[in-house]
Amino acid sequence: MAAGKSTIGKKLARKLGVKFYDVDDMVVTEHGPVSDIFYAQGEQQFRKYEYEAICKALDSEPGIIALGGGAVTYDESLKVLKKRAYRVFVKVPPEQILGRLRRSHTVRPLIGATPSLSKIKELYTARMPRYSHSDYVVEAQDMSTAQVVDQIAQWLHKKNIKL
């Protein structure tokens, strides 16, 4: 949620010369705007669409996949990611997320039109147990996008992970 996953993912994919997949964009292309899906069909249906997009990306050529912040809350998504992908958590503190959301023009269905620190902390706390089991955690609080990209690329190299 507003950690910069899509921006980082695009730049990392470019740096590594691999394909980039944005799960939210894939869902929007297939099913329409995220907020419309949430309001008309509910979060559970959105998570199913998200899972389908994740599977489609995993079945395509190797690359970097940017997930929505809540993707790992859907058990099937988490299972397939654990089995078939390396998971990187870009950790940004709730206060920084709030600042980014306030500057953004995108309404996040689980946050609403007026983001609050308490709501962000609530989601963050609920999701943290799943985030913390990532293969790699980047403490991105005071890092530029380029620094985060470099740190992930270095980790991939160090682990001898080829995409």
Please describe what each predicted stretch is.
Residues M1:
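The conserved Walker
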Residues S6:
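Walker A/P-loop
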Residues R14-V23:
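Post-Walker A helix-loop "phosphate-sensing" segment adjacent to the P-loop in P-loop NTPases
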Residues G69-V72, P93-E95, M143:
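Short glycine-rich anion-binding loops that position phosphate/pyrophosphate groups of nucleotides
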